[in-house]
Structure formats: structure tokens, C-alpha cells
């Protein structure tokens, strides 16, 4: 069978061990490396010195990511392949090591590379994934806040739509100060716009809904929860800025176009 690569390397990845089989024509050399950055750089130097044209590795857990990043940074071409695809290729001998088998398949062009986005796209995806996890954590905290308020018989959700909004926060800060809301206090808060002017509920309904009973422990827990929400909101805003700065002009333009579709927003 014709050889696609004269000099190539197959890599068998483990958590703390990397087995590399470097093929050069009909000759091969197998070396073991650790998984530290220093050892990965040593392997990259070894492959560069040998004139390696392509490196192939299995998509094993997330072990491939640091190695792929280092090879990419060092200017070496690499591909990540699906383990099931390799198992489907016939002809493997029982005594052949995984790294040797990967190298042999690579040398003869029998491997199909999985799609790996470029470095900028990978980093953008990491930002988006992390933002999504923080948004999920914020939603869970808001649910905890809602249950905490219900336990104190404060029915803020029936008065204010957005429990994470400015109006809700102003009211909660007022209640945490230990003050109840009577008719006169309502008028003062309304004048100061602590209570928003666009609420649909009546004055009497708002007063009834917001006057609950909170113990000292409930107030302490709510304060911790609100502080955590502030941190999450700040981190999400920071990630929004990072994502915006990471996007290329054409990506931003495409994002604007797709937002014309109903239900699609900037964070979708």
C-alpha cells in the first residue's frame, strides 16, 4: 500500500503516560513520555528534529487537548481521530502496540481526522461554555432566592416580573434593612423609584405581597445569596465583553443577521 507520509507519529494517550511511535520510512522508534508540559515540549522537540510531517492521536477523554495545543504552538501538524474508526480498520496484529497501529494507519492515509476548530475558535467556545455554566448557576441561585422569599411569605414574584432586576433588588435591600412597607413608606419608595412606576399590581396588593416575616438567619442567607448573584452578574458581563472582543468582524455581522430570526438574541 502506498505511503502518504514518510515521517509521521502515532500517539497513544493516557492520563500520565504518552507512548509515541515515530515512523520514518520502514523504520520506527517508540518512546514513552510523561504528561507534564516539560515532557510534552520534549516530545515536540523530538518530532521536530525528526522532521515529522503529521501526528495522530485518539480523542481520549480530554487528554488530547494539552498535547494538541502544544504541538500546534510548536508548528507541528496534528490530527485527532475517533477510536471507533480505528477499531473498524481490519488487519491489526494482536502484538502491535496502540501507538504503532495509529502510526501505521496514519502513514498509509487510513485515518479520518475529526474536526478541530482553530485556536481562536476553541478559546471562543471555552468562553461561551463557561458563560453558559455561570448563567445556569445564576438561574439556580434565583430559584433558591424565590424559595427563600416564599418561606418568608414575601410574594415578590406576584408583584415584579424580573426577580433579578433593579426594582426587585431595591425592594429586597429595603426589606433586609428590617423595615416593613406601609402606605406612607410605599409612597416614599414610589417617589424615589425604589418601587417601579410600571408595576401592574395595585398599591394595596404590593404592600400585602411584600410584607413577610424574615428571621435573622433568613436575612443572613439572603444577603449571602444576593452577594453571590452580584458576583455572577459581574462575571457574566465580563465574559460578554470578552466574547465580543474575541469575535471577528464578520462573525459579529453574522450574529446581527441571525438575530432577525424571532427568538434568537445576542446570547443565544
Predicted regions and their residues:
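A detector of single, family-specific signature residues
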Residues: 1-268
Amino acid at each position: 500500500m502506498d505511503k502518504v507520509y514518510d515521517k509521521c507519529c502515532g500517539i497513544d494517550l493516557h492520563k500520565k503516560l504518552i507512548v509515541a511511535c515515530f515512523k520514518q520510512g520502514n523504520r520506527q522508534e517508540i518512546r514513552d513520555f510523561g504528561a507534564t508540559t516539560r515532557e510534552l515540549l520534549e516530545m515536540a522537540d523530538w518530532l521536530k528534529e525528526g522532521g515529522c510531517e503529521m501526528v495522530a492521536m485518539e480523542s481520549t477523554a480530554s487528554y488530547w487537548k494539552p498535547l494538541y495545543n502544544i504541538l500546534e504552538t510548536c508548528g507541528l501538524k496534528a490530527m485527532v481521530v475517533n477510536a471507533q474508526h480505528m477499531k473498524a480498520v481490519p488487519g491489526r496484529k494482536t502484538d502491535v502496540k496502540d501507538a504503532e497501529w495509529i502510526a501505521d494507519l496514519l502513514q498509509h492515509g487510513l485515518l479520518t481526522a475529526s474536526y478541530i476548530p482553530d485556536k481562536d475558535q476553541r478559546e471562543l467556545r471555552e468562553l461561551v461554555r463557561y458563560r453558559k455554566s455561570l448563567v445556569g448557576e445564576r438561574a439556580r441561585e434565583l430559584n433558591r432566592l424565590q424559595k427563600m422569599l416564599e418561606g418568608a411569605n414575601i410574594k415578590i414574584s406576584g408583584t415584579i416580573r424580573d426577580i433579578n432586576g433593579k426594582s426587585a433588588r431595591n425592594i429586597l435591600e429595603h426589606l433586609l434593612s428590617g423595615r416593613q412597607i406601609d402606605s406612607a413608606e410605599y409612597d416614599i419608595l414610589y417617589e424615589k423609584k425604589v418601587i417601579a412606576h410600571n408595576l401592574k399590581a395595585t398599591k394595596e396588593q404590593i404592600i400585602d405581597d411584600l410584607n413577610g416575616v424574615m428571621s435573622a438567619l433568613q436575612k443572613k442567607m439572603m444577603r449571602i445569596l444576593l452577594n453571590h448573584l452580584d458576583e455572577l452578574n459581574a462575571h457574566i458581563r465580563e465574559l460578554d465583553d470578552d466574547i465580543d472582543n474575541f469575535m471577528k468582524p464578520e462573525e459579529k455581522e453574522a450574529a446581527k443577521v441571525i438575530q432577525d430570526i424571532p427568538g434568537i438574541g445576542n446570547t443565544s
